[in-house]
Regions:
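Class II aminoacyl-tRNA synthetase catalytic cores and aaRS-like
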Residues: 1-592
Length: 592
């Protein structure tokens, strides 16, 4: 079959936007479905806006009809014809009331039989879909996500441009500096044995831009981190990156709140109430057992240490004596939902997180308590009262150090919330998490390590603790959390040269290391720096939530898989020996 050309024709309308008025149109797209009914043929033509039905009648134009008989699924077509009402209306389609009676059909490209049905691929193996990603990207669901992501990027630029931000590009090849994850390294051909690093973030460059006087910076920045993947993480991602001078934390948060309000109203029609609620890190952990709390439902953690301190139960007593606590969550209706076997699974899950075990009170017809023999008169009633329990509830209790108890109950809270169906769909609960810990304790190496990049400003009232009490140092850093997912992180930056030196020293860096890794930035601060701070918002993750997608793969055109490879192009791959020689690189074989 000889293929046609577009000569003499140009598209007048997208398929999903063909008007209902009678007029001549030219549409282009992929053949979605072909129905041959003898003397009639109907072809659903698909493009990124939707479908339109093409109609062919052998009595009207035999030549065009015969060409339509050649069409198969996924052929690329161009069709000219008159819009007319359909005999049978399809209410599911935007163009379901009309069809195009075709007078000129062009077959521009043929398709072999596809390895899966493009528009019905939900049950198709993910590996197969990723291998043929260009076909899966034709799926209307996936196209809708990609187009929504485009709209998010468009609104993002509009908002920040309107608020005086300058979009400035920062280098993609930079010096390797410690930022938490492993760098992707790029060997230099010109400088043998030396490497560039792909940016984990534009952090250093955007701070230099503030020192340079560009007081409002924005960039949709590509970032790279060589770390293990999960459902909400990719080795390369896009960050809505911003920095502001002559501001404080509240100014930056107010700017972001305005952006969130505009974005959710324009994309989803959702009204976001401002200002967004705030929780300190300590309060978030105490109430929800997480620094990324899902606040769409209750089931908050209750501290019952004082209530149970006199109960002669060694699990409780040893935890309290060791400076820990006894805390609980009340799973409303959980006694009815959870069987004893399912409760045992919760216990095992708690152990998997790090807890030694889990006590419980299952109040069905009668209270069934896992530590009943240790209870004195009135103890059970006191516990029930402390957590607001009533008949039908399940109380889960954990006793240990707070760093074990809180994340354990926080994880169980989410599991039980999903199991009971109490987490509302279609609800968007934002919360700022503030006053983040400045240091984290590394049990393995028995030392305090930085919880943030080394340019994060400590809170003024905590400066005296830097040398004496690292556990009490809080940072001028914050996260924006939506429905239990961290959307963004931000902080105020250190602008005092001496404090920055002290911070490097607190992180165990020698003068030589400081000079080698950050010498150019330290030098820049010698020439004065305005007060500044900024944030990074994950565009991929934001898109995933707005699109209600299950994975970042559903909002990224060409994603990587769990082992950081791309199945479609089979990368990473080996390269020619000549290329390696030019880069002064030799490879060694690794036994698998």
């Amino acid at each position: 079959m000889k293929l046609d050309t577009m000569k003499g024709l140009r598209r007048t309308h997208y398929c999903g936007e063909v008007p209902e008025t009678e007029q001549e149109v030219v549409v282009c797209g992929f053949a979605d479905r072909v129905r041959d009914m003898g003397n009639l043929i109907f072809i659903n033509l698909r493009d990124r806006t939707g479908l339109v039905q093409l109609a062919f009648n052998d009595e009207t134009d035999r030549a065009v009809f015969e060409k339509a008989q050649l069409v198969k699924s996924e052929y690329v077509l161009m069709a000219k014809g008159m819009v007319r009402p359909r005999e049978s209306v399809n209410e599911k389609l935007k163009t379901g009331k009309i069809e195009v009676a075709v007078t000129d059909l062009r077959i521009l490209s043929k398709a072999e039989t596809t390895p899966f049905e493009v528009t019905n691929s939900d049950k198709v193996n993910d590996e197969l879909k990723l291998k043929y990603r260009y076909l899966d990207l034709r799926n209307p669901k996936l196209q809708k996500n990609i187009i929504t992501r485009h709209k998010i990027a468009q609104i993002t630029r509009e908002y920040f441009y309107d608020n005086g931000f300058l979009e400035i590009e920062t280098p993609m090849m930079m010096k390797s500096t410690p930022e938490g994850a492993r760098d992707y390294l790029v060997p230099s051909r010109v400088h043998a044995g030396k490497f560039y690093a792909l940016p984990q973030s534009p952090q250093i460059y955007k701070q230099l831009l503030m020192i340079s006087g560009y007081d409002r910076y924005i960039q949709l920045a590509r970032c790279f981190r060589d770390e293990d993947l999960r459902a909400d993480r990719q080795p390369e991602f896009t960050q809505i990156d911003l920095e502001m001078s002559f501001v404080d934390q509240e100014d930056i948060q107010a700017c972001i709140e305005g952006y969130i309000e505009k974005l959710f109203k324009e994309i989803l029609g959702v009204e976001v109430t401002l200002p967004l609620p705030r929780l300190t890190f300590a309060d978030a952990m105490s109430r929800y057992g997480s620094d990324k709390p899902d606040t769409r439902f209750g089931m908050e953690i209750q501290d019952i240490t004082d209530t149970v301190k006199d109960i002669d139960f060694v699990v409780f007593k040893s935890a309290i004596e060791a400076g820990g606590s006894v805390r609980a969550i009340n799973v409303k209706g959980g006694a009815v939902t959870y069987t004893r076997k399912e409760i045992d699974k919760l216990v095992e899950h708690a152990k998997g997180i790090g807890a030694k075990g889990l006590a419980y009170i299952r109040w069905a017809d009668e209270p069934n308590c896992s530590f009943k023999k240790f209870l004195g008169e009135g103890d059970l009633e006191k516990i029930n009262a402390a957590v607001g329990a009533e008949k039908g509830d399940l109380i889960l209790i954990c006793a240990d150090k707070n760093k074990v108890v809180l994340p354990t109950l926080g994880a169980l809270r989410l599991i039980c919330g999903k199991r009971l169906g109490v987490i509302p769909e279609g609800k968007f609960n934002f919360v700022w998490i503030t006053e983040m810990p400045f240091f984290e304790y590394d049990d393995e190496n028995d030392t305090w390590v930085a919880a943030h990049h080394p340019f994060t400003m400590p809170m003024e009232e905590c400066l005296d603790y830097l040398d004496t009490d690292p556990a009490n140092v809080r940072a001028k850093a914050w996260d924006l959390v939506l429905n239990g997912t961290e959307l963004s992180s931000g902080s105020m930056r250190i602008t005092d040269f001496e404090l920055q030196q002290k911070m490097f020293e607190a992180l165990g860096m020698t003068d030589e290391e400081i000079e080698a890794k950050f010498g150019f930035l330290v030098d820049a601060y010698r020439y004065a720096a305005p007060p500044h701070g900024g944030m990074g918002i994950g565009l991929d993750r934001l898109s995933m939530i707005i699109c209600n997608a299950d994975s970042l793969r559903d909002v990224i055109a060409f994603p990587k898989v769990q082992n950081s490879s791309e199945l479609m192009s089979a990368c990473p791959s080996t390269v020619d020996e000549k290329q390696l020689e030019e880069l002064h690189i030799k490879t060694t074989e690794i036994e698998e």
